[in-house]
Every structure is written in C-alpha cells, then in structure tokens.
Amino acid sequence: YRLVGGVNFYQRQEIKDILAYLKTIDSGRDDLSVTRIVNVPKRGIGQVTLNKLAVYASEHGMRLFQAMEQAEQIPGIGKAADKIKGFVNQIMVFRALAKELDAAELIESILEQTGYLEELEKLEEDKAQAKQENLDEFQNKAADYYANHDEAALTDFLEEVALVADIDNMDSEAD
C-alpha cells in the first residue's frame, strides 16, 4: 500500500472512474457510479438530461441505469436518447465481455474502447504518465487478485477493492 502525493490510491480520479465503470458493468445498481461515468469520456449528455433520467427513475422505482435503458420513452429527452443509448450499449458489450475476461483484461477493454486512454493523452505529459501508471497498477492489482482466486467473478474483485479502500481510508484518517 503506497500513498502517492498524499492522495489515497483509490481516491484518485482515474481509479474512481474505472471503478465506477466496473461497478456499472457488474450491476448498474450504483447510481453514483453511473452518474460519474456517463460523460467519461465526454458523450455530450447534459445535466438537464441526467436530471430528467433521475426523476423518471425515481417516479418509476428504478435505478438510473434502468431509466437510461428506456431513454427513448422518457418525455423531453429528445436527441440525447441516442447518446444515452450509445452509453447503455457500450455497458452491455462490457457486461458480455465480463463473462469471458478477468478484471484486468476488462479494464484494458474499458480504457481502449471508451476512448479513456485517448483523453489521457491530451493531458500534460507528466500528468498523463502518472495517471497511466496508476491505471497500470490497478490492472496489476486486478490480475493478482484473479491469479490468487480461482473462479473469481467481477463482483468478488469489487468487494475486495471496497474492503481494501475502506482499510486505506481508516489508515489515512488515523495518520
């Protein structure tokens, strides 16, 4: 466990982004994760649209991701429905991949297929490199987990990460 620049590893933006993708792929039940990644990288889905989705989800007793799956039926969503559908379809593709790949391979697919890596390349070189190193480290943690746990599923890996992140938070609060 290492503290880099005073920020807990699991509190780093790029790690939180990829964790949010993994949680959304795993179940889609975490509305915060869905909200975090719907525009990472940018997809042009605005706050007004997200608010309409959230209201629809609330009124119909469903999760945000479930509302997104029905976006074209929601009044006032308009052209944004296509962008939302693109996001939903991408998550569905990742869900299918998650059945065949371990988390490290899935992370690689997310980074490449979403354009996340391309976005990183637009940053200042040292910032981009630091973020890439953190993502590599996270992939290594995922690979290690799967190497040490036969029959591990994405849910198991996410539970492990949550546990480690909680312990890291307690450690950093104790300092």
Regions found by a protein language model. Give the residues of each.
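Conserved helicase C-terminal RecA-like lobe
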Residues: 2, 12, 19-175
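Short, acidic/turn-prone active-site loops that include or flank metal/cofactor-
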Residues: 5-9
